[in-house]
Amino acid sequence: MPFERCISNEDKEGDYFMKNIFSREELLIGKENVEKLKKSKVAVFGIGGVGSYVVEALARAGIGNFVLVDNDNIDITNINRQIIATTKTIGKAKVEVAKERILEINPDAKVNTYKEFYMPDNKIELTSNISYIVDAIDTVTAKIALIQEADALNIPIISSMGTGNKLEPTKFEVEDIYKTSVCPLAKVMRKELKNRGIKKLKVVYSKEEPIRLEINSNNKVPG
């Protein structure tokens, strides 16, 4: 049965979506926490192999406000690993396709998009009302700049390390940057962040040896 026939006009005009789409989640975490998610604002930098799945998961979890930052358009080579990439979205801006997916999941969500590269000389102004930042950027210098800004504004942030050229998903861990090992990107980041006085950073990284990977501060990170 088409979705339009499953809900009444009264449901469409009320808060049907938050009460029903996230009703199973409410059973798990409680109404108060569902409301917290609804009021939260998450900024995701980099809507690629990592960031696109982060956005999808957060939307389905009930996050109510998003800031999406990425300058890329979807390419045919993205289809094998990015959830926003299909034959119908090739050539479209990643941030706009991600926004459309969010609103298809939760029409009540608020989404601000920035089709820009986040770099030290081209920063998106962050505000204190951001609840959390997800760093899924693929350039080391940009990652460092974002982490520094989040630290200065006291905004919680989690950073994705290298995910490309790896095959074993069970090797991924959430850890502080200074407790990481094996990951070439994490090694570079530890050095750069230590030099800048950053004392801690939550990261997602893999202990799997990459098939082939060389990282320095000017490289893009496969993902």
Give the ranges of each region predicted by the language model.
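Conserved N-terminal Rossmann-fold NAD(P)-binding element of oxidoreductases
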Residues: F45-G46, V69
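Conserved SAM/SAH-binding loop
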Residues: K115-N122
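N-terminal charged helix/coil linker that caps or initiates catalytic domains
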Residues: D15-V42
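Hydrophobic/small residue at the entry helix of a nucleotide-binding pocket
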Residues: V50
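Glycine-rich phosphate-binding loop and adjoining beta1-alpha1-beta2 segment
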Residues: D70-N106
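Glycine-rich phosphate/adenylate-binding loop
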Residues: K12-K19, K38, L126-Y132, I137-A145, ...
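Conserved S-adenosyl-L-methionine
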Residues: R60-N65
